[in-house]
Amino acid sequence: NKLLISSLVVATTCGLTACSDSNNPNPAPETEMPAEYYVGGKLGTTFNNTASAYEQFTEAVDNQGLVASFKRGERIFESPFDIDAQSETPMRGLGPLWVRESCIACHPGYGHGARQNNYNSNTIGNGYLLVLTDENDTYLSSLTGMPQTGSSAPFKAPIDERKIQIKWLPYTDEWNNTFPDGESYSLIYPEVTIPQDAFYVPLQVGGVDIDYSQLRVRLENTIGIYGTGLLDAISDDDIRAQYRAEEAAGVSLNPGIWANGDFVSYYTNNVQGDGTKYVRRYTYALSRGSIQDGPGANAIWNITNVTRSDRRYHYMTAAYAKVASKDPDVQAQFYKYYPAMNKTGNVETDIYNYLMSN
């Protein structure tokens, strides 16, 4: 009976709502919300409280008439790309090498990646990216900044991800894993090993071979998409002041980014941008400086290696192109998969030129 009464009340309420006048000639004026309601600022706050709120556009997007653009970007973000190059395939152009087949694979629900026990790039929610450097923390030049483990025929992946090992080990911190009130907690950290035979390319820094013993491997995990744009609201002066404070305190800072009280280098883009200098503030490697040309705007293309009309080049290293162009297995099948690339009759040259977008 209680269920029946509740159902009747809900039905009656819905009926009354449906009969209300939706064309009120004297609508109540919109009231400005208190400042504390805009936790993400007026441009970054949504009042959508559904289960998918973090995937929705904000009020500012709607007010500027940008919902259609948001939806187009959402489709690119959420859809896996295909290696099929036929014009009727909507999400085509994956490869020839890639980090992931889609953006959402690393950002499920637009959030961060989940902890993994192995490096399988096809696992939805695996937001791990490899960070490969020498013992001086200099990135390997023979691999892309975000190393690729996927490939389409006839090419071979730069790293065989099946051989990557991830072990989670216990860790004891400086407080002996104990809160001030005596309660204890446990910590773990990943130990990542990539055997030497997993690499298809030589290990190089600045184009010079290094010994395998010099290799350092770290894991970088994705962060949630929502809220990251607020980093753009931090002024350059505030970032500069933070660097100066840390330098004065004796903190070891990257000399390639900061030295003697100021930035050594800035982020610029002379290809899709106008060459404006930006303070580096995005990505693990501080390789981006503006939200309009930030990690997401570039990763959509770098992660999948999809090209576009104003970005006609592959996310690729010359070291990989050189190795692949000399690989007999690749040479034997290249014209089968890429007949239009038979431009010189020299298969080694054609492979190299294709990969390097020459």
Predicted regions and their residues:
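Bacterial N-terminal signal peptides that target proteins for export
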Residues: 1-7
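Bacterial Sec-dependent N-terminal signal peptides
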Residues: 7, 12-37
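Extracytoplasmic redox metalloprotein regions
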Residues: 48-49, 53-69, 78-358
